[in-house]
C-alpha cells in the first residue's frame, strides 16, 4: 500500500521512530510522494494482472501507526484508489490494513473483495462487523508451540468462520524460527477439518 511504502521510504531505522516528526514537517512532500506511489503501483498491478495474477493483495503493514484522524487521508483514500483500479481490471482484491482498529469503517469505505485481519483482531467481533469474506487472523507465534496447541487454535478459527466465507491464514508472516514441520502440520490440520 502507498502508506507502508512511504513509511519505509522516509524512515532510515524503525518505522516507529521519528515518523510523527517527518509526517508533520514534510506534509506537502508526503502528499506528492503518495500520488507518485499511486501511479507507480497501478502500473505494477496492471503488469501483475497481464502476467496472470488472479487476485491482488494490498499489504498496509504500517496502517496501525496512524491515528483515527489521519487514517482516511493516508490509508483509506489511497487504498480506495487502488481497489477501484484493481476492480476495473476485473480482479478481486484483498486488503490487509494491519493494526487498525476500525475494520468495519475500512471495509465500508475502501470496499475490498476480502479483508485480511491481523492476529490482534478478535475473530468473533470482526465476524459481526463485516459481511465480506475474511482472511487470516491466527497468531503466527502459535507455530512455536506444540502440535496440540496449534491444532486447537487452528480449529478454533475454522469453527468461528465455518458459516462465513473464510480464507485460512496467519494474522501476519511466518516467524523465521518456525519449524517447517509445524507448518506442514498446520496445513494438514486445515485440510483435514
What are these regions (language model features)?
Residues 1-193:
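Active-site loop segments of alpha/beta catalytic cores
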Amino acid at each position: 500500500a502507498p502508506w507502508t511504502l512511504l513509511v519505509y521510504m522516509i524512515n532510515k531505522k524503525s518505522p516507529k521512530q521519528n515518523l510523527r516528526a517527518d509526517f508533520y514537517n514534510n506534509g506537502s512532500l508526503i502528499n506528492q510522494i503518495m500520488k507518485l506511489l499511486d501511479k507507480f503501483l497501478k502500473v505494477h498491478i496492471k503488469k501483475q494482472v497481464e502476467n496472470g495474477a488472479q487476485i491482488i493483495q494490498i499489504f498496509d503493514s504500517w496502517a496501525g501507526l496512524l491515528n483515527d484522524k489521519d487514517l482516511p487521508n493516508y490509508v483509506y483514500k489511497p487504498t480506495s484508489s487502488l481497489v477501484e483500479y484493481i476492480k476495473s481490471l476485473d480482479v478481486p482484491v484483498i486488503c490487509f490494513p494491519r493494526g487498525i482498529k476500525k475494520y468495519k469503517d475500512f471495509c465500508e469505505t475502501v470496499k475490498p473483495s476480502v479483508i485480511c485481519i491481523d492476529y490482534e483482531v478478535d475473530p468473533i467481533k470482526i465476524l459481526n462487523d463485516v459481511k465480506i469474506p475474511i482472511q487470516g487472523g491466527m497468531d503466527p507465534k502459535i507455530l512455536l508451540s506444540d502440535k496440540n496447541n496449534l491444532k486447537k487454535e487452528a480449529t478454533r478459527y475454522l469453527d468461528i468462520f465455518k458459516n462465513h466465507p473464510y480464507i485460512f491464514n496467519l494474522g501476519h508472516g511466518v516467524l523465521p524460527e518456525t519449524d517447517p514441520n509445524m507448518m506442514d502440520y498446520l496445513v494438514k490440520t486445515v485440510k483435514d477439518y
